[in-house]
């Protein structure tokens, strides 16, 4: 029994690691697509694409996955992918936005609607929750190995054209106007900074606490959305209390 139990524990950890790795690859694929779509598909002529490709290699993302994401943007793979945004409410009334890249709108719409419905949420009309989010540029720089304190980093960010900065224990988060993200990114790179993230994202104005009895349903919704191959990104205005605090 102990050997059987040990095997299941190992398998369980492996499955969790595989799921986490898959979500990382999914986000990188989205970033590759957007970088290639917005600029030249040749990384030598596209700094943003080059940055994301470096991140993909660091995450040990297979070469064919990297190329597939770029092909989606250029149409080289033969399929015509569309960008579609879905908006809705998760369990507890939490606003959720789902960005998709799909070659079959009917398939994607059915899957997204099913995810919301089966989790106790509801899919809304265009504009039903997007007003609760702000579109912003986000640049992240890891603090590890960085010879800069918070004040110096803030001055460099503002000089580069950023709007604001927040510091956490492990990183600096630099916020920009969406149209200025590229120029701020380039200015920081010219100063020698290594960027962990440089993207335009959706940031909620306020977060809604998920009721304790809805946390399981809510997490099921997010997991189902993120596991869908058509889903490029999920933005949520949720505050989820730690399990230990909720009990």
Swiss-Prot record:
GO terms for biological process: regulation of DNA-templated transcription. Its main location: cytoplasm. Keywords: Cytoplasm, DNA-binding, Transcription, Transcription regulation. It comes from the Bacteria. It is found in: Cytoplasm. Residues 1-22 are annotated as: Disordered. InterPro entries: Integrase-like_N, TACO1_YebC-like_2nd/3rd_dom, TACO1_YebC_N, Transcrip_reg_TACO1-like, Transcrip_reg_TACO1-like_dom3, YebC-like. GO terms for cellular component: cytosol. Pfam families: TACO1_YebC_N, Transcrip_reg. One of its GO terms (molecular function) is DNA binding. Belongs to the TACO1 family. This is Probable transcriptional regulatory protein LAF_0541. It comes from Limosilactobacillus fermentum (strain NBRC 3956 / LMG 18251). The lineage of its organism: Bacteria, Bacillati, Bacillota, Bacilli, Lactobacillales.
């Amino acid at each position: 029994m102990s050997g059987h139990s040990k095997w299941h524990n190992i398998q369980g950890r492996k499955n969790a690691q595989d799921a986490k790795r898959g979500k990382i690859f999914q986000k990188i694929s989205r970033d590759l697509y957007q970088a290639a779509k917005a600029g030249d598909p040749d990384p030598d002529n596209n700094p943003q694409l080059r940055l994301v490709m470096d991140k993909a290699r660091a995450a040990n993302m297979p070469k064919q996955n990297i190329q597939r994401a770029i092909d989606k943007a250029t149409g080289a793979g033969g399929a015509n992918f569309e960008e579609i945004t879905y908006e809705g409410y998760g369990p507890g009334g939490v606003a959720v936005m789902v960005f998709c890249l799909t070659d079959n709108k009917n398939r994607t719409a059915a899957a997204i609607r099913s995810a919301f419905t089966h989790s106790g949420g509801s899919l809304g009309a265009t504009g039903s929750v997007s007003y609760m989010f702000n579109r912003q540029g986000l640049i992240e720089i890891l603090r590890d190995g960085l010879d800069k304190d918070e004040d110096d980093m803030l001055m460099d960010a503002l000089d580069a054209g950023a709007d604001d900065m927040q510091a956490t224990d492990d990183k600096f988060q630099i916020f920009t106007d969406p149209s200025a993200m590229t120029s701020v990114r380039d200015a920081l790179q010219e100063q020698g900074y290594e960027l962990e993230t440089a993207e335009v994202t959706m940031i909620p104005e306020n977060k809604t606490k998920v009721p304790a009895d809805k946390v399981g349903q809510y997490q099921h919704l997010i997991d189902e959305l993120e596991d869908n191959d058509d889903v490029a990104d999920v933005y949520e205005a949720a505050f989820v209390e730690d399990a230990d605090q909720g009990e």
